[in-house]
Amino acid sequence: MKDRYILAVESSCDETSVAILKNDKELLANIIASQVESHKRFGGVVPEVASRHHVEVVTTCFEDALQEAGIVASDLDAVAVTYGPGLVGALLVGMAAAKAFAWANKLPLIPINHMAGHLMAARDVKELQYPLLALLVSGGHTELVYVSEPGDYKIVGETRDDAVGEAYDKVGRVMGLTYPAGREIDQLAHKGQDTYHFPRAMIKEDHLEFSFSGLKSAFINLHHNAEQKGEALVLEDLCASFQAAVLDILLAKTQKALLKYPVKTLVVAGGVAANQGLRERLATDISPDIDVVIPPLRLCGDNAGMIALAAAIEFEKENFASLKLNAKPSLAFESL
């Protein structure tokens, strides 16, 4: 049987990425051009800057992916692209490149939801068993998703305010840490103790909604008041206390969801899934009867490899889009 090759494009935020997937789950290439250095001085992603960087490198990413995979355009069977959610300007750059490439090479276009990509990155670890529950944690999203079968997603809980990754970056900025702050906070947290006792919003309520704005505000107020009074704060303990509160919230809601939706598999994905503290808590707090599947670190952040892994499923269902496909920056799972 002829091998199948899918080229995937991801540009929803501040990474330009192009990947090549062979057959169902063999990633031959996953080129990622990161913009982190460009956004550090701003303390966050500047949409206009992100869009310009995508324009500068996207063609090179296509070339590098094909070269690394050892194939040419005529070997490809489809092109997949993230069409939302994300920054509209950033999405449009990747979509324009993907659509032009698909048109020039007479290839079908597969539209992929960015968050579905994060979820399906877990396919790199093992073939997923359905139905399953997913905890998706990133800079822009915090969601619990019930997946009855491949491609059938239902959000059963989400944040009412800040996403968990956003909260990490905001408190990191207050402490003077480098953007993005998640990894550094995680490392410092492992050296400290939970001594500041921050609030855990809605942790005892039965619903599956999250909230991190109160935790963020409590952290900022503590830090500000200490500065005003000239009191010294222990950085490691601050990070440990903040992370303990975040993880308590995430684990409490996930455990409630597992009781409500009796599944055998829990996928934890998104940029924050790289957090070692979260991985440790999942190992100790989640029942051994639940198969916890977390993508490898290389597939936790934004990358086109995860888009390709999601696209393999959509290809089988012949879920193709016309070249009139437009970016949907606020795309939800229910829109699939």
From Swiss-Prot:
Residues that hold Fe cation according to the record: H114, H118, D302
Subcellular location as annotated: Cytoplasm
Signal peptide per UniProt: none
Catalytic activity: L-threonylcarbamoyladenylate + adenosine(37) in tRNA = N(6)-L-threonylcarbamoyladenosine(37) in tRNA + AMP + H(+)
Nucleotide-binding listed as a keyword: no
E.C. number(s) listed in UniProt: 2.3.1.234
Recorded GO MF terms: iron ion binding; N(6)-L-threonylcarbamoyladenine synthase activity
Family annotation (PANTHER family): TRNA N6-ADENOSINE THREONYLCARBAMOYLTRANSFERASE, TRNA N6-ADENOSINE THREONYLCARBAMOYLTRANSFERASE, MITOCHONDRIAL
Name the UniProt record assigns to this protein: tRNA N6-adenosine threonylcarbamoyltransferase
Species of origin: Streptococcus agalactiae serotype V (strain ATCC BAA-611 / 2603 V/R)
